[in-house]
């Protein structure tokens, strides 16, 4: 029997992080549920033990059910008939197994049937599911919608929907439209208040909706007549049982084929308002998207793990010139870099998740009582860290997942191009990761302000101030030099206009990420030898990557920008 949690000691290691004691204590609000609910922990150790046991259950289901089903699900896919979607048989089996195990609603309060887990084990579960089947991870991960309802909906709506989600009712977040993709301010699906029926009615079309035929939908719609911007949008919850929504078609996709992506038609579909009018995009969707981006970070790490394991396994099994190909420097370098990127992504994932955990726990406590001045200050700090690290995580982890999937095929050679091996599916599944929930380019837009205002640099200096063991001193010296190089690169783009900064934004964000991820690997390696080799490999690679970026920025001028900008005036010639 395979267990995707027990076969990877790096996961359980995350529960030993020093910040976990604070996270668990805040999440459990000093363990007030103990004695009130079955299985509510009495202390930090009790809570961590529960996390560990549930991860074992999920790991076993991933290894024994989800992963064996993945190839057939990819082949079969969902079917759309008569305006409804039917999952592939394996997808339904996956969903049933996780529902019966009671692992939906991991992070929701116990009063609604959840387990009240912190975000760290929830994200870990998402990583496990993604390693098994990245497509199914979308269906399972859309329980994130419950977090939004819990945070912003009325008590009545919470009581109506949250217990159902915890029991396995599926969700979707219906945001994008044919003319509103990344630019959600352009959403035009109309929400109209019906005085006679005393309800909201939704009319219009949604496109590229993951798990589009879900039982429970969160829908972004235009409630304010005559508006054209984000301030006219509100957020609604819809129950499939109420009728009024049909599936026009499902998309024929490159990858994640088990996850149905649908175009939907709303015709007088009844819905309930979530929170306040006009805050749909500027508050509620932004919160949901941050959670979704964290989820894609976990999905990316899971895909990276799957790609690396397949490549390593094949490299040991495949013999050429009378020896396993893992013995050739060209191959073992590739594998070492794959592992370093994987472990660096995982380090950034859980660092980001810990920041999210702390500020979310404080926000939950603030709903019950007034925070002390010290708590408010702490909350502000971790909220800023979460905002800084989330776009960096989403960009870096998804890009590395694509690179690792690409290299996994390369290790397999011609065999990797064939469907007999899972790496071609992993490669196809990985491609969406840099696109949905905000492209890598949009993550750069979100992250660059933390470069220009010095926030990343300040955090790097915090890591720099930490003591390291003698064996890591040389690596730290390299990072100190790389930090000075990063400062110089930042100064080089100042006072040259917004377009110039935007042009170099990705290079600058990546430079910061390489330094941060190197430090995180060194920090992990201080207490776990499993990270030591990757800390060395990644830091040395990061130095080379940053040298290239710094050199390009230093030799670039405003005049050089014109050669790139000229492409705006080119068009593809078409025959009449």
Positions of PLM-derived features:
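C-terminal helix-coil-helix/basic helical segment that borders enzyme active sites and/or dimer interfaces
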Residues: 343-394, 490-503, 522, 526
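Alpha-helix capping/hinge segments and adjacent helical runs
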Residues: 2-6, 10, 17-19, 102, ...
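A short core secondary-structure module
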Residues: 199, 203-245
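N-terminal leader/propeptide and maturation segments of large enzyme subunits in energy/redox metabolism
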Residues: 17-61, 148-154, 331-349, 355-377, ...
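C-terminal amphipathic alpha-helical interaction region
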Residues: 112, 454, 466-576
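A glycine-rich, basic-preceded beta-loop-alpha segment at the flavin cofactor/substrate interface
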Residues: 39, 241, 248, 260-292, ...
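Internal helix-loop-helix
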Residues: 59-60, 90-167, 210-212, 436, ...
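Extended, charge-enriched "interface" segments that sit outside catalytic cores
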Residues: 1-81, 85, 571-576
């Amino acid at each position: 029997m395979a267990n995707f949690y027990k076969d990877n000691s790096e996961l359980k290691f995350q529960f030993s992080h020093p910040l976990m004691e604070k996270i668990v204590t805040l999440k459990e609000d000093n363990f007030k549920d103990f004695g009130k609910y079955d299985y509510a922990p009495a202390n930090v150790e009790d809570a961590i033990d529960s996390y560990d046991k549930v991860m074992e259950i999920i790991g076993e289901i991933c290894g024994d059910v989800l992963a064996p089903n993945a190839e057939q699900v990819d082949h079969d896919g969902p079917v759309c008939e008569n305006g409804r979607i039917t999952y592939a048989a394996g997808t339904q089996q996956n969903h049933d197994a996780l529902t019966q195990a009671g692992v939906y609603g991991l992070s929701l309060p116990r009063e609604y049937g959840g387990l009240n887990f912190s975000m760290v084990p929830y994200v870990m579960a998402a990583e496990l599911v993604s390693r098994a089947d990245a497509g199914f991870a979308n269906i399972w991960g859309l329980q994130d919608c419950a977090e939004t309802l819990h945070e912003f909906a009325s008590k009545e709506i919470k009581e109506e929907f949250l217990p159902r989600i915890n029991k396995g009712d599926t969700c979707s977040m219906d945001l994008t439209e044919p003319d509103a993709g990344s630019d959600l301010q352009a959403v035009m699906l109309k929400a109209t208040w019906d005085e006679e029926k005393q309800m909201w009615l939704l009319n219009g079309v949604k496109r590229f909706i993951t798990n589009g035929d879900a039982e429970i939908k969160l829908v972004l719609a235009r409630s304010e007549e005559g508006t054209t911007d984000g301030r006219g949008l509100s957020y609604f919850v819809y129950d499939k049982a109420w009728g009024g929504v049909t599936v026009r078609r499902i998309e024929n996709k490159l990858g994640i084929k088990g996850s149905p992506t649908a175009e939907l038609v709303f015709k007088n579909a009844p819905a309930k308002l979530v929170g306040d009018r006009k805050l749909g995009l500027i508050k509620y969707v932004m919160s949901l998207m941050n959670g979704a981006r964290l989820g894609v970070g976990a999905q990316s790490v899971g895909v990276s793990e799957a790609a690396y394991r397949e490549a390593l396994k094949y490299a040991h099994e495949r013999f050429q010139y009378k020896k396993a190909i893992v013995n050739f420097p060209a191959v073992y370098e590739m594998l070492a870099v794959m592992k370093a990127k994987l472990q660096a992504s995982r380090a950034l994932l859980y660092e980001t998740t810990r920041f999210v955990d702390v500020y979310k726990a404080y926000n939950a406590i603030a709903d019950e009582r007034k925070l002390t001045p010290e708590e408010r200050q702490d909350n502000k700090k971790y909220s800023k860290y979460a905002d800084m690290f989330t776009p960096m995580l989403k960009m870096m982890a998804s890009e590395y997942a694509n690179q690792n999937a690409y290299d996994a095929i390369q290790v397999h050679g011609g065999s990797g191009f064939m469907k007999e091996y899972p790496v071609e599916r992993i490669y196809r599944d990985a491609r969406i990761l840099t696109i949905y929930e905000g492209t890598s380019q949009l993550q750069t837009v979100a992250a660059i302000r933390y470069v220009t205002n010095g926030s990343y640099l300040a955090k790097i200096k915090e890591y720099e101030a930490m003591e390291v063991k003698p064996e890591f001193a040389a690596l730290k010296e390299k990072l100190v030099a790389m930090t000075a190089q990063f400062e110089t690169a930042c100064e080089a783009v100042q006072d040259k206009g917004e377009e110039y900064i935007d042009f170099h934004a990705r290079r600058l964000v990546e430079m910061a990420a390489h330094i941060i991820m190197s430090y995180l690997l060194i920090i992990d390696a201080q207490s776990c030898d499993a990270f030591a080799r990757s800390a060395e490999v990644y830091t040395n690679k990061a130095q080379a990557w940053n040298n290239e970026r710094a050199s390009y920025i230093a030799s670039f001028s405003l005049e050089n920008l014109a050669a790139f900008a000229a492409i705006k005036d080119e068009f593809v010639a078409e025959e009449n």
